């Protein structure tokens, strides 16, 4: 069955607009995906007809809002096949989820002389929190290097582990190269050394199904806004036994059981003790609608369509004069490139004049830029609403830029 891309596009109102007098070709979904009417309408309806503060309210609106929020927690747990909805913490996004783990589990479990393993392809959100933790604790940060094709040098991984390795923190899919890392093999190796595993799933959950039980990771985190949902909301999954042992990171309302000026404070049970303050309830409702949307289309069908489009894009882009493509042949979601010796910002500005939106810069992956010896790259990302025609426009635009700039 053919993927209904035109029907999907009709659900995204922003795709009907023009930029610089030309139809918008939005090739920046890896930074943040556009939102379908179903998400916009669900969040709008909540604010119009159902808004109230959640938790402890005895009135109807509060009870309904609380129930709606907790239903999304259950829905998200099914989406990633968690064992229990109580293994999921609502966070602002992937970055906050990783910082929560670093400041809660990490503070409790990392000691001087311990080490944490990351890779050279990580987003800054999966580098900086571990650097800060290691500096605080006197621990060591170890790095898995890259092959020139943008895959990890896994033959070096075993040597990085030892009896002081406490955590492997690894991206599921690179936000620059599109490399999908072989998590089962990497997690199995971590288990041999008794290390925990955190997976940054920000660039994975929109492209194919994720099963955290099958992966057997300890932590998995992703953002709603890359999954066609609202900004400011994400999910942190933690194995239940581990989550129940973790101390809270932030203090405030909703995360307590009792508060006394003389007897101190006791915490709510997990996951609620990690959700201090008023939650982004509207964002949570929107996230639920986004999960409904991609589930109704079928992640397998989305993935098949995107892979077909990716193969076509790589074939066509390879024909552009003086282009350098970064990353492996088999990839998900993104194509990073440079055009001759022209700065990525200049190329991106020209493309914007043609109505084509791509991302330029270091993509929050400065160590990866340093490895390739470039200050920046252009990145085109492909989502379920992109088309062959938009790929053709990108190729034509780059060919024209090459002709104009030489």
Swiss-Prot record:
The modification N6-(pyridoxal phosphate)lysine is found at residue 226. GO terms for biological process: cysteine metabolic process. GO terms for molecular function: cysteine desulfurase activity; pyridoxal phosphate binding; selenocysteine lyase activity. One of its GO terms (cellular component) is cytoplasm. The active site is at 364 (cysteine persulfide intermediate). Its EC number is 2.8.1.7, 4.4.1.16. It is found in: Cytoplasm. Its cofactor is pyridoxal 5'-phosphate. Keywords: Cytoplasm, Lyase, Pyridoxal phosphate, Transferase. It catalyses: (sulfur carrier)-H + L-cysteine = (sulfur carrier)-SH + L-alanine; L-selenocysteine + AH2 = hydrogenselenide + L-alanine + A + H(+). Its main location: cytoplasm. InterPro entries: Aminotrans_V_dom, Aminotrans_V_PyrdxlP_BS, Cys_dSase_SufS, PyrdxlP-dep_Trfase, PyrdxlP-dep_Trfase_major, PyrdxlP-dep_Trfase_small. Pfam families: Aminotran_5. Gene3D superfamilies: Aspartate Aminotransferase, domain 1, Type I PLP-dependent aspartate aminotransferase-like (Major domain). PROSITE patterns: AA_TRANSFER_CLASS_5. Pathway: Cofactor biosynthesis; iron-sulfur cluster biosynthesis. Belongs to the class-V pyridoxal-phosphate-dependent aminotransferase family. Csd subfamily. Homodimer. Interacts with SufE and the SufBCD complex composed of SufB, SufC and SufD. The interaction with SufE is required to mediate the direct transfer of the sulfur atom from the S-sulfanylcysteine. Cysteine desulfurases mobilize the sulfur from L-cysteine to yield L-alanine, an essential step in sulfur metabolism for biosynthesis of a variety of sulfur-containing biomolecules. Component of the suf operon, which is activated and required under specific conditions such as oxidative stress and iron limitation. Acts as a potent selenocysteine lyase in vitro, that mobilizes selenium from L-selenocysteine. Selenocysteine lyase activity is however unsure in vivo. HAMAP family: SufS_aminotrans_5. This is Cysteine desulfurase.
């Amino acid at each position: 069955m053919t993927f209904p891309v035109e029907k999907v596009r009709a659900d995204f109102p922003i795709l009907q607009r023009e930029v610089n007098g030309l139809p918008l070709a939005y090739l920046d979904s890896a930074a943040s995906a556009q939102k379908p009417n179903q998400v916009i309408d669900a969040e709008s309806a909540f604010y119009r007809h159902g808004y109230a503060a959640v938790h402890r309210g005895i009135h109807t609106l509060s009870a309904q809002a609380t129930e709606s929020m907790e239903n999304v927690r259950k829905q998200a747990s099914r989406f990633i096949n968690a064992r229990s909805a109580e293994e999921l913490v609502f966070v602002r996004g992937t970055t906050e989820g990783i910082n929560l783990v670093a400041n809660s589990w990490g503070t409790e479990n990392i000691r001087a002389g311990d080490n944490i393993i990351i890779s050279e392809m990580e987003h800054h959100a999966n580098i900086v929190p571990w650097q800060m933790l290691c500096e605080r604790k006197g621990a060591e940060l170890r790095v898995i290097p890259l092959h020139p094709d943008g895959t990890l040098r896994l033959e070096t991984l075993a040597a990085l582990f030892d009896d002081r390795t406490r955590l492997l923190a690894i991206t599921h899919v690179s936000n620059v190269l599109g490399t999908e890392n072989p998590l089962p093999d990497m997690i199995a190796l971590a288990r041999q050394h008794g290390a925990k595993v955190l997976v940054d799933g920000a660039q994975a959950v929109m492209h194919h199904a994720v099963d955290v039980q099958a992966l057997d990771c300890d932590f998995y985190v992703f953002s709603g806004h890359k999954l066609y949902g609202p900004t400011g909301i994400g999910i942190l999954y933690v194995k239940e036994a581990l989550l129940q042992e973790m101390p809270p990171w932030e203090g405030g309302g909703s995360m307590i059981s009792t508060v006394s000026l003389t007897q101190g404070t006791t915490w709510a049970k997990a996951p609620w003790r990690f959700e201090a303050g008023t939650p982004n309830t509207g964002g949570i409702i929107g996230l639920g609608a986004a999960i409904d949307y991609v589930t109704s289309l079928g992640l397998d069908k989305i993935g098949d369509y995107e892979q077909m489009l990716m193969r076509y894009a790589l074939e066509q882009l390879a024909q552009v004069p003086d282009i350098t493509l970064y990353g492996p042949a088999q990839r998900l979601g993104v194509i990073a490139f440079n055009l001759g010796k022209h700065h990525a910002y200049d190329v991106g500005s020209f493309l914007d004049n043609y109505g084509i939106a791509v991302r330029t810069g270091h993509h929050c992956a400065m160590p990866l830029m340093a490895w390739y010896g470039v200050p920046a790259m252009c990145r085109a990302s492909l989502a379920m609403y992109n088309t062959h025609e938009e790929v053709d426009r990108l190729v034509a635009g780059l060919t024209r830029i090459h002709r104009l700039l030489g």
